[in-house]
């Protein structure tokens, strides 16, 4: 099992495929529906030979959501430019899956600081909190919000508030006393978290690398994807965006839904690349929505540790005029 990277460059494709093969081997622990069993001790509790961790708690501005943030700091000395750093949503689930063998792999290259942003719960997900924090406000047409009903019943639309908390309170505390390379600051999210990453790519310049895994684009009838494809490249020259999507999907529409979704994403990525934006599509063949969490977060970490960036010279050239 491997991931296909849709862009030119055989050597880069082979390197990425090798990295994600490893990520997928570690990604066997995944579920079509969230496993809400209480979590046991994680790598921060057990200790690591390659990273040390600190934990901090935060509250939302309205006092309704409560966060726990794990910051994993490599024991390996920082490079002259500073550590890369990856902010990871659904931090409880990430910490439950973060393993010593993976940390060892990261340490063998350029290990990133890992900031796992979770909630003050012993469950892998706080479903109500993440639904609010990770989703942008729905587009309003004719006085009504454009979005799906049914499965999308939890209150959403709080991504702007959460992004403000993440960038203005959580990040300064997480990076305190650590030498960070701001040019290698990334963010990863899965499902609703993937939506947050896309919305942040449009709305914020705090990060440089944006990893959006299986974003729940159907929530707003793909209007967010339309906004992405209409982006002016001059505003986004300094950013890299990675769509990470499995080419299988659970449920009764497994034969039609993935093809439609992937086709729309492929077309969107193609349009963005043609306009000079630094965008890639990473395909995980045969991986369903749930297991994409495991495969994609490991893929993002491994990618960050290589120090690779997308070629954005065309964008840089146009922006300098």
What are these model-derived regions, one by one?
Residues 1-10:
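N-terminal secretory signal peptides that target proteins for export/translocation
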Residues 242-252, 259-321:
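C-terminal catalytic histidine-bearing segment of alpha/beta-hydrolase fold enzymes
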Residues 189-193, 197:
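Gly/Ala-rich beta-loop-alpha elbow adjacent to hydrolase catalytic centers
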Residues 82-165, 169, 173:
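Serine-hydrolase catalytic machinery in alpha/beta-hydrolase-like enzymes
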Residues 179-190:
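Alpha/beta-hydrolase fold nucleophile elbow
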Residues 30-83:
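A domain-start/cap signature at the N-terminus of enzymes
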Residues 203-239:
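Mobile cap/lid helix-loop segments that gate and shape the active-site cleft of serine hydrolases
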Residues 17-26:
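Bacterial N-terminal signal peptides
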